[in-house]
Amino acid sequence: MSFSLILLAAGNSNRFKSILPKPYHKIGNKSLIEISLHKILKFKQIKKIFVVINEKHQKYTKKLNLKKTQLIKGGKTRQDSTFLALKKLIKIKNKKNVLIHDAARPNFSTKLLSKIILKSKMNSTVIPRLNISNAIKKNKKNRFVNIK
């Protein structure tokens, strides 16, 4: 079973409050996009990778090592960007299995991705569910403190 993957990196990162868009920020010597790609490229089942970028961010994209990927111009919203990538994907034969990931979230586990791929063999749709942790903590004086 083979897959194509859409890596969404076309957002404006408005909430991030930085001139440099979030997917291009580095942890160590790799951008968030490159960290995601490094993990994704470990999976032989993923045959085609589309990186959806914001046209305004091409100067950042050119500096990255985006091996084995095809760049696609994104839309105004995440939904538009996903749709544009899916339209490109339709043109490729035998590409019915699609994975979608947000480039600004590189801390996914490869174990989770393995499970998604495995479950895809038995199901037409797989959506991972992760437990969330509270962002509000109770301190010693029985008061709630918002952790940012």
Residue ranges and their predicted role:
Residues 94-105:
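Short beta-strand-to-loop acidic/aromatic patch adjacent to the donor-nucleotide binding site
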Residues 2-58:
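N-terminal glycine-rich phosphate-binding loop and ensuing alpha1 helix
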Residues 43, 107-148:
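Conserved core of the sugar-phosphate nucleotidyltransferase
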Residues 58-64:
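Acidic helix N-cap motif at the loop->helix transition within catalytic regions
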Residues 47-49, 97, 124:
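Residues at the starts of beta-strands that form the adenosine-phosphate
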Residues 14, 78, 103-107, 134:
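Acidic metal-phosphate-binding loop of nucleotide-sugar-dependent transferases
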Residues 64-96:
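Short phosphate-binding loop-to-helix
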Residues 6-10, 52, 100-101, 127-131:
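Short beta-strand segments
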